[in-house]
C-alpha cells in the first residue's frame, strides 16, 4: 500500500477584540503611543488591520502605533481578519500655553496716587483662536475667568500694591472639546 501524509493549516478566527485604552483618547499634537489589544481566543490566527479616518490629524500604523499630527478628532478602527471591528477616537487638543511670565509695574496717576498693573505674557499657540485668563486672590480661593484675549498677553489693571495674585491661561480652539488644559498657577 500507499501512505499519504498531509499537513492541514487550520485557521482559528477571533471571537473577540478589545482595545485597553479609553474609548476617547485625549492627547496633544506630537503625542505618540500604541494601542494595547486583546484578541480571543488565545490561539486565534487573526491579525488586526488599523485605519484612521483622518490620517492628517492622527496617523496609525500596522502595529496600532498612533501619532497626533494636528489638532482635531480622528476615528481609529481596528478590524480582525475575521471581521470584528472596534472603533476608538483620538482627540488632539491644543497644547497648554507655555513660557508664562508676570511683570508687576506701578504708574503715577497724580503726585499722591499710583495705579498698579500686572502684565501676563505667554508663548503664542498658532492653533488657538483666543485665550482665557483666570485669576485668584489667594491659594484658598477659586480661579475666576477675568479676560478673553486673542493675543498672548494680558494686562491686569485691577491689582493692589503688595498683594499677590495667581494666574492661569487656557488656549481656546474653535471646537471646545479641543481646548488646552489650564497652565499651572503663576504668582
Go through each PLM region and give its residues.
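Extracytoplasmic soluble-region selector
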Residues: 1-94
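Short beta-strand segments enriched for Tyr within beta-sheet-rich domains
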Residues: 33, 131, 165-169
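Beta-strand-rich modules
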Residues: 156-177
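Extracellular low-complexity, O-glycosylation-prone stalks/linkers
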Residues: 125-145
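Short beta-strand segments within Ig-like beta-sandwich modules, predominantly Fibronectin type-III
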Residues: 57-60, 145-150
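Hydrophobic core positions of the immunoglobulin-like beta-sandwich fold
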Residues: 66, 154-157
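Pro/Thr/Ser/Gly-rich low-complexity, intrinsically disordered linker/stalk tracts
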Residues: 94-127, 161, 176-187
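Predominantly extracellular/luminal cell-surface or secreted proteins
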Residues: 51-53, 134-139, 168-172
Amino acid at each position: 500500500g500507499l501512505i499519504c501524509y498531509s499537513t492541514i493549516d487550520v485557521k482559528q478566527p477571533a471571537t473577540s477584540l478589545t482595545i485597553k485604552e479609553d474609548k476617547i483618547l485625549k492627547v496633544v499634537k506630537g503625542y505618540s503611543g500604541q494601542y494595547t489589544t486583546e484578541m480571543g481566543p488565545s490561539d486565534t490566527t487573526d491579525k488586526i488591520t488599523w485605519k484612521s479616518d483622518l490620517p492628517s490629524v492622527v496617523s496609525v500604523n500596522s502595529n496600532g502605533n498612533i501619532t497626533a499630527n494636528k489638532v482635531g478628532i480622528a476615528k481609529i478602527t481596528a478590524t480582525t481578519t475575521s471581521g470584528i471591528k472596534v472603533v476608538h477616537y483620538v482627540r488632539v487638543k491644543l497644547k497648554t500655553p507655555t513660557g508664562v511670565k508676570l511683570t508687576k509695574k506701578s504708574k503715577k496717576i497724580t503726585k499722591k496716587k499710583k495705579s498698579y498693573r500686572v502684565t501676563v505674557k505667554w508663548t503664542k499657540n498658532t492653533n488657538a483662536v483666543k485665550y482665557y485668563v483666570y485669576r485668584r486672590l489667594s491659594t484658598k480661593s477659586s480661579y475666576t475667568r477675568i479676560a478673553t484675549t486673542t493675543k498672548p498677553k494680558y494686562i491686569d489693571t485691577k491689582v493692589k500694591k503688595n498683594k499677590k495674585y495667581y494666574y492661569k491661561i487656557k488656549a481656546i480652539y474653535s471646537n471646545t472639546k479641543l481646548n488646552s488644559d489650564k497652565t499651572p498657577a503663576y504668582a
